[in-house]
């Protein structure tokens, strides 16, 4: 972590904390001991953290404890190690305290449910389906069912109540729509454990299983903006929002690869593995290819940020700047969080 990175414009690589090395030609198994390398393009984007980071982190832990969403020791410790409050403080450094606390609690809720239920060993769509139905009911009615078997629906209803106070109606609607896609994606994720999906299918769903599409929708309100429909529909603005969500999910697949391989005892079925299967590549070459996909998206995002920063349309330059900081905080996210660290 203390090594000096090369110039971002040369697109060098920076080492992970620890990683895995893969035998040449091996697409199925990996051996612990080497380093995966992640493209270093972060110097293209600014980065800073909200001064409210510590306060928000503490508040989210209190919120989680109050709702008793995670009572098992293992998932509970991993959730605390995620440091969600500090992560949102990096993504949205200019957000006011109440909005930053809400965003942290929302991501803590999503992560807690994913850790406890979606990632549970052997979970089936039949077991997960009733949870999804209850969440959709909360999205539609704003209230939780009276006899819910877990506190998750009631906690979601509370989060949506707070959203109505903090967001404009259109911003709230966008967040609800993206949450609905998350619930579909959670069911989809269970189906991928018994089949190999295409990279196209994976890339369609991954921004929702990683919650990055939800995160991208929060950039506007967290920057204090209320963009018009015309601005939101602008192709450049839409593509930049998509690039942010894509970069978040792709870089997570790279940075978490070593941790997931170690935790699973096998190669994680994420983007590098899927590229290896689809193209017949050794896993190390497929990992490098996934890194190139990240580089290409980063270059595109950088170009769009430059173009939109010069726009005369109201709110567009400010939105471009907010996205730039959301991208730029990504590398520090993996320095701040202990969730994916090798032991």
UniProtKB/Swiss-Prot annotation:
It catalyses: (13E)-labda-7,13-dien-15-yl diphosphate = labda-7,13(16),14-triene + diphosphate. Belongs to the terpene synthase family. Substrate binds at residue 206. This is Labda-7,13(16),14-triene synthase. Mg(2+) 2 binds at residue 119. A motif (NXXXSXXXE motif) lies at residues 252-260. Involved in the biosynthesis of the labdane-type bicyclic diterpene labda-7,13(16),14-triene. Catalyzes the conversion of labda-7,13(E)-dienyl diphosphate to yield labda-7,13(16),14-triene. Mg(2+) 1 binds at residues 114, 119. InterPro entries: Isoprenoid_synthase_dom_sf. Mg(2+) 3 binds at residues 252, 256, 260. Keywords: Lyase, Magnesium, Metal-binding, Plasmid. Binds 3 Mg(2+) ions per subunit. Its EC number is 4.2.3.192. One of its GO terms (molecular function) is lyase activity. The Asp-Asp-Xaa-Xaa-Xaa-Glu (DDXXXE) and Asn-Xaa-Xaa-Xaa-Ser-Xaa-Xaa-Xaa-Glu (NSE) motifs are important for the catalytic activity, presumably through binding to Mg(2+). Its cofactor is Mg(2+). A motif (DDXXXE motif) lies at residues 114-119. Pfam families: Terpene_syn_C_2. The keyword Cytoplasm does not apply.
């Amino acid at each position: 972590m203390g090594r000096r990175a090369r110039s971002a414009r040369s697109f060098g690589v920076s080492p992970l904390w620890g990683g895995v090395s893969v035998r040449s030609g091996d697409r199925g198994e990996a051996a612990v001991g080497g380093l995966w390398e992640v493209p270093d393009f972060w110097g293209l984007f600014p980065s800073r953290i909200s001064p409210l980071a510590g306060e928000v982190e503490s508040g989210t832990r209190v919120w989680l404890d109050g709702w008793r969403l995670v009572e098992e020791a293992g998932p509970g410790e991993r959730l605390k190690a995620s440091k969600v409050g500090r992560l949102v403080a990096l993504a949205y450094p200019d957000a006011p305290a109440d909005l930053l606390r809400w965003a942290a609690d929302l991501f803590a809720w999503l992560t807690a449910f994913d850790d406890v239920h979606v990632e549970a060993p052997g979970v089936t769509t039949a077991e997960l389906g009733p949870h999804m139905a209850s969440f959709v009911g909360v999205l539609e009615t704003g209230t939780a069912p009276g006899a819910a078997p877990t506190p998750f629906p009631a906690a979601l209803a509370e989060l949506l109540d707070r959203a109505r106070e903090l967001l404009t109606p259109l911003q709230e609607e966008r967040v609800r729509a993206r949450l609905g896609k998350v619930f579909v994606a959670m069911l989809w994720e269970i189906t991928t454990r018994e089949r190999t999906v295409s990279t196209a299918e994976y890339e369609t769903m991954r921004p929702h299983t990683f919650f990055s599409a939800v995160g991208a929708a929060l950039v506007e309100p967290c920057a204090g903006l209320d963009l018009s429909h015309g601005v939101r529909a602008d192709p450049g603005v839409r593509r930049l929002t998509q690039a942010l969500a894509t970069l978040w999910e792709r870089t997570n697949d790279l940075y978490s690869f070593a941790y997931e391989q170690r935790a699973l005892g096998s190669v994680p079925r994420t983007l590098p593995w899927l590229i290896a299967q689809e193209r017949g590549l050794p896993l190390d070459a497929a990992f490098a290819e996934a890194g190139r996909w990240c580089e290409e998206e980063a270059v595109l995002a950088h170009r769009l940020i430059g173009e939109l920063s010069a726009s005369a349309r109201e709110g567009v330059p400010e939105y471009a700047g907010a996205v730039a900081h959301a991208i730029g905080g990504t590398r520090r996210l993996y320095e701040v969080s202990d969730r994916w660290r090798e032991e």
